[in-house]
Amino acid sequence: MSNPDFQAARLTVRLDAVVANYRLCQRLVGPASVSGVVKADGYGLGAVAVTRALAAAGCDTFFVARLEEGIGLRKVAPSARIFVLDGAAPDTVPALITHRLTPVLNSLAEIAGWSAAARETRSELECAIHIDTGMSRLGLPGEELSRLASDAKHRLEHLRVVLWVSHLACADDPTAKMNAIQLDRFRTALAMLPPAPASFASSGGVLLGKDYAFDMVRPGIGLYGGNVQHAPKNPFAIAAVLTGRVLQLRRIDRGESVGYGASFRAKRPTVIATVALGYADGLMRAIGNRGVAAIAGARAPIVGRVSMDLVTLDVTDLPPATLSTDTEAEFFGDAIALEEVAAAADTAAYEVLTAIAPRVPRHYTGAPA
């Protein structure tokens, strides 16, 4: 008979840590308000549980990327203001209105379309407007900004701008000159436009100081424990721990290989732990023969390739008392930082976190989920 409590892999989500990180942001940027960025299913932790925890802590504003995310979140946060970063493409306008979602408009064309919808519905529609200050992705570039500023009364007719938004390109590096350049550009843009609250800082921007806070900040990965500026001591509490269960322990002789491609060969008699976690679970394949895991706080190198459902560790030097088929190995969390995994995979902590697959159960602690 199968054990219903058995979980081969698990992502433990500490909702109290998410709330603690929210509180830290409040202390750092007050009196500016703090929203919650819960796009990509709350950076992989679970948007529903995270939103409920943040709402219980007093957060009343959330950001998502996709329309579908906003529709789902509305069921969880019926009275919250929910911004949709993707904007308002013509075919999304009816759903945005129906679900009371606030689009972050990214072009004059979107502004015109949203204004037309307001006229058709004979209502004043809320929006945020994104000003591109250097990312060159979404948002009004300089030429469109000038056109909006010169004819704002007409172009914004029937609209209520509740937020001017921009986004920092290099907030993870407090020494980057680009931060000050973008700050100056955003201030210049705001001086050209009708008054409304402004938002500039994401998690990294929160740590840049109150000059970057304006009226609202938008922390994302900081809420989830990311060390966004790679500080010697992470100011944010660890909110997610990824573990996999040891399925088998075996001893191999010197010269024997491990895994596909025989990419690892033992240089000594070696104890191998095979763990129920693989790239189908979101473990980065690139960390094979490069990354580490931890068992009872002791580090063990990943040896051989990461396969679809399994990964292998060299646990030869770990205390035998810590090793059994009941043992859990940590792949990020308390002993292994997200950023260390990202470095081993030559990627960003954001990808490590958001890559965790749906088949990995989320286990919530610290607050009602």
Predicted regions and their residues:
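Active-site anion/phosphate-binding pocket segments in diverse small-molecule metabolic enzymes
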Residues: 2-22, 27-29, 69, 88-90, ...
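Active-site-proximal beta-alpha core segment in soluble small-molecule metabolic enzymes
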Residues: 2-12, 17-20, 30-200, 213
